[in-house]
């Protein structure tokens, strides 16, 4: 099965591991609109667009899959594949609540311009990335007991928000780092994400080996 076909479906934990992916979740930011896309993979397709944007409107149009207008905003390394699937699913559920179930309430809480519309500059609405960060924090709070085993690689320090105000009080042991990059080049970003994936798989294998050794000793 080609990589492109593989990412057009939701994938369970066992499949991700067998296919050679790392236990990660990816957040991509649209450079033109500010919208954020969630993916189980270091890339995305129309499938992720359809899943993430189920109730598009003129303020929140269904975005294009053009790779040059998307930039990786964050990569989350999880301790195992089940948790990576759980975080991805919860992010998608929270997006559905914001865009469909409680769309009016969500819009009421957003910063408005003089016309009463969600504030924007040109086509860019910063509220979408802010909401994505808030939702990610909410999802990781569900894994508070294993927070020291979770690492979030951010596009930059500014993107995560105020660490002392929003993160440390509730997730003090969560690991934060920033993505190493020289510029906004898709090929370079792809290489960085591939390297992060390899590191995450190595860490997963190392932890499992330690757990297996500890179990053998206890027996």
Swiss-Prot record:
It is found in: Nucleus; Mitochondrion. GO terms for molecular function: DNA strand exchange activity; single-stranded DNA binding; structural constituent of ribosome. Keywords: Mitochondrion, Nucleus, Ribonucleoprotein, Ribosomal protein, Transcription, Transcription regulation. GO terms for cellular component: mitochondrion; nucleus; ribonucleoprotein complex; ribosome. GO terms for biological process: mitochondrial genome maintenance. Transmembrane segments: none annotated. It holds the Pfam family Mhr1. Its main location: nucleus. Signal peptide: none annotated. Transcription factor involved in regulation of RNA polymerase II-dependent transcription. Also involved in regulation of mitochondrial DNA recombination, maintenance and repair, and generation of homoplasmic cells. Belongs to the mitochondrion-specific ribosomal protein mL67 family. This is Large ribosomal subunit protein mL67. The gene is MHR1.
């Amino acid at each position: 099965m080609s990589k492109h076909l593989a990412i057009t479906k939701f994938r369970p934990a066992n499949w991700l591991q067998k296919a050679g992916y790392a236990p990660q979740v990816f957040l991509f930011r649209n450079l033109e609109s500010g919208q954020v896309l969630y993916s189980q993979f270091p890339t995305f397709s129309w499938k992720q667009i359809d899943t993430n944007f189920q109730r598009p409107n003129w303020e929140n149009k269904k975005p294009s899959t053009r790779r040059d207008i998307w930039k990786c905003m964050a990569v989350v390394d999880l301790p195992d594949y089940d948790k990576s699937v759980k975080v991805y699913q919860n992010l998608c559920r929270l997006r559905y609540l914001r865009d469909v179930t409680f769309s009016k309430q969500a819009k009421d809480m957003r910063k408005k311009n003089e016309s009463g519309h969600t504030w924007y500059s040109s086509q860019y609405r910063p509220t979408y990335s802010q909401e994505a960060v808030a939702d990610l924090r909410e999802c990781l709070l569900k894994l508070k007991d294993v927070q020291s085993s979770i690492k979030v690689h951010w596009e930059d320090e500014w993107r995560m928000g105020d660490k002392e105000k929003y993160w440390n009080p509730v997730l003090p042991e969560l690991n934060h780092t920033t993505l190493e990059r020289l510029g906004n080049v898709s090929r370079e970003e792809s290489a960085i994400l591939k390297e992060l994936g390899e590191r995450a798989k190595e860490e997963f294998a190392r932890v499992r080996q330690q757990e297996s050794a500890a179990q053998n000793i206890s027996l």
